[in-house]
Swiss-Prot record:
InterPro entries: Ribosomal_bL32, Ribosomal_bL32_bact, Ribosomal_zn-bd. This is Large ribosomal subunit protein bL32. NCBIfam families: rpmF_bact (TIGR01031). Coiled coil: none annotated. The gene is rpmF. The lineage of its organism: Bacteria, Thermotogati, Thermotogota, Thermotogae, Thermotogales.
Amino acid sequence: MAVPKQKRSRSRTHTKRAKIYRTVSVPISKCPNCGQPKLPHRVCLHCGYYNGKQILEIAE
């Protein structure tokens, strides 16, 4: 059965574990049609445009 050769120090363990809990920043771009912030490669929820085409009908 596999057994570790040496004990892992507390700082090494915490450093490795800290990467699990690190948050990932979400890239936010501006909609070229209305200028509102939106997620990339997704339809704008404010105007309904994606890639210069009307995809969703948004009631104002």
